[in-house]
């Protein structure tokens, strides 16, 4: 399965929500990264046919864009999925099957996939936040789509539920394209094969986590500063971590200039997020 996106653009009045996006995606998990307003939801909504692009093309192997077959290829989990909370899990999926003309025999198998089979007779309003999110994924995958899109699926979940969700998506990813939009970049650690960075509707970068770390490590420095000088460094540089050491602090920061400080031995995905979006949060 392949998605070919060429020169994709979308405007809202005079504002560019997406600005000439070109990507080629094959099977695997992708993290779609960016702060609020970066264009992530618009991008996913265009991909699954909810809204129309203004220019550019989308090709999906042999499937014609927006044809009847196209809608069977995609599963979509929006940021705020509509769940009928007075229904049981089983009743809700029966409704989804009727809506999509899918055999109801798929329900038990799908509930087992998302680890909700034991809750099939429980009303949705009694489920935890993590269970509701897994049920949202169940309704999106019940027809076994080849492409699964998830918009901020980990928002509001505790660390245990986030880990369960990551494991579920990893198990679902064989021979599928899964795109997960998030501003919590650490959720993509050891999950996404590549990260797609959006900012103001533009594509900033598209690399594997390992490639990103190798290419950006040169911009990160570390040093030890006194408590008295700490604020000066925070105001001068984009500081990504502060660790107390006795009466001093070990700080990590990035700079596009050649600094006289030692380079960091290690950086992580949170450092990379700050590298791309530190200026966005400085303005808030």
Which role does the model predict for each range below?
Residues 148-152, 157:
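Catalytic Walker B motif of ABC-type/P-loop ATPase nucleotide-binding domains
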Residues 56-70:
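Conserved ABC transporter NBD signature motif
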Residues 167-252:
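ABC transporter nucleotide-binding domain
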Residues 48:
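Helix-to-loop junction immediately C-terminal to a conserved catalytic motif
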Residues 94, 98, 104-120:
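Conserved ABC ATPase "signature" region
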